Swiss-Prot record:
Protein name in the entry: Erythronate-4-phosphate dehydrogenase
Domain of life: Bacteria
Function text: Catalyzes the oxidation of erythronate-4-phosphate to 3-hydroxy-2-oxo-4-phosphonooxybutanoate.
Pfam (any one): DUF3410
Lineage per the UniProt record: Bacteria, Pseudomonadati, Pseudomonadota, Gammaproteobacteria, Pseudomonadales
UniProt entry keywords in alphabetical sequence: Cytoplasm, NAD, Oxidoreductase, Pyridoxine biosynthesis
Length: 380
């Protein structure tokens, strides 16, 4: 069996070497010639897997070790009888950690009380749903916009217009889609961006084109009261440098790049491939993950929740380092910037998740226990 795989997928040999020969390539270099003799294709979000790419190839299974599927031609797969799998939720905790770290950084820069802000979460799936749980565990005011879930479940979901009108902080967690009633391409266009409240913060850690980047640049240039945090960009790996200069934090699509999340994505695709081949999944991720360097934290149960959040979050992640590395990469010509963007992702240093922490609460736990559980950490 011949496997073609993105070279940046972690634990490739550990999970897939026993299936057959692995041919590794940069994700953006996977083309028709590369898959001409492949049985299995393993990718990340940087590789568009289209009908044209796979035409004439023997590929029977496509696995993307990522949470999203907008880079996969699912209709084409169905017509060609190709099995596929993604890794829903694999990096959700890492993205939530990124958003929380960004909020703490913004609060420090702006000198504001996070508890006094109203939060709008757009998209309440694997990532957004977990973020909502954390914000509610903190006792903060949260509005949620998710039209597909509202149609399916009813509930207390609100419109995007209400989010724009009422929320001081807006965090985007939608997939990218161009068609249908819930299309998200340029969901925040110039008209909607101009509706942002005075002093609003906008965080996008979903897909770059969910926000019209040109319009966002223009609005940020005109309104100094707004703050933006962008981890994703239209036209990646090319970045709108002028827009990046106006963002309080900018990073190279690494919000979900925790060590745990990336390796979890590989494990999920391994399990899906085993199911496709009718083989037992005997390799366990827990046997491969290294021990975290910060394993346990003790907190006074009466601690202020924001202080506790800061201790737990900063213990595993601070986005300012990634922001600094990203800004250093935006020098030189366009070609150099594109290469630097991918290099930052390829050589991203190991980062663990709050979920891997064990937390001991001294005294009556009360509401702090709810926060720890919402963060995914383990109470001991």
């Amino acid at each position: 069996m011949r496997i073609v795989a993105d070279e940046n997928i972690p634990l490739l040999d550990a999970f897939f070497a026993h299936f057959g020969e692995i041919h590794r390539l940069p994700g953006r270099a996977i083309d028709r010639a590369a898959v001409a003799n492949a049985d299995i294709l393993l990718v990340r979000s940087v590789t568009p897997v289209t009908r044209e790419l796979l035409e004439g190839s023997p590929v029977r299974f496509v696995g993307t070790c990522t949470i999203g599927t907008d880079h996969l031609d699912l209709d084409g797969f169905q017509q060609a009888g190709i099995q596929w799998a993604s890794a829903p939720g694999c990096n959700a905790r890492g993205v939530v950690d990124y958003v929380l770290g960004s909020l703490l950084t913004l609060a420090e820069i702006e000198g504001v009380d996070l508890a006094q802000r109203t939060y709008g979460v757009v998209g309440a799936g694997q990532v957004g749903g977990r973020l909502v749980d954390v914000l509610k565990a903190l006792g903060w005011n949260v509005l949620v916009c998710d039209p597909p879930r509202k149609s399916a479940e009813g509930g207390d979901f609100v419109s995007l217009d209400e989010i724009l009108q009422r929320c001081d902080v807006i965090s985007l967690h939608t997939p990218l889609s161009k068609a249908g009633a819930s299309a998200t391409w340029h969901l925040l266009d110039e008209t909607r961006l101009r509706q942002l409240r005075q002093g609003a913060w906008l965080i996008n850690a979903s897909r770059g084109a969910v926000v019209d980047n040109t319009a966002l640049h223009d609005v940020l240039h005109e309104r100094e009261d707004l703050q933006a945090v962008l981890d994703v960009w239209e036209g990646e790996p090319q970045v709108n440098v002028a827009l990046a200069d106006l963002c309080v934090l900018g990073t190279p699509h690494i919000a979900g790049y925790s060590l745990d999340g990336r390796q979890r994505g590989t494990a999920q695709i391994y399990q899906a491939l085993c199911a496709f081949l009718g083989q037992p999944a005997v390799i366990k991720l827990d046997d491969l993950l290294p021990k975290p360097w910060l394993a346990q934290v003790s907190l006074d149960a009466s601690s202020d929740p924001v202080w506790a959040l800061n201790m737990l979050c900063r213990g595993v992640y601070d986005p300012r380092r990634d922001d600094a590395d990203f800004r250093r990469s935006l020098t030189g010509d366009t070609a150099s910037q594109r290469l630097a963007f991918d290099a930052l992702r390829k050589h991203y240093p190991p980062r663990r998740e709050i979920e891997g922490l064990k937390v001991r609460l001294e005294g009556e736990s009360g509401g702090l226990a709810q926060l720890v559980r919402a963060l995914g950490a383990v109470l001991v």
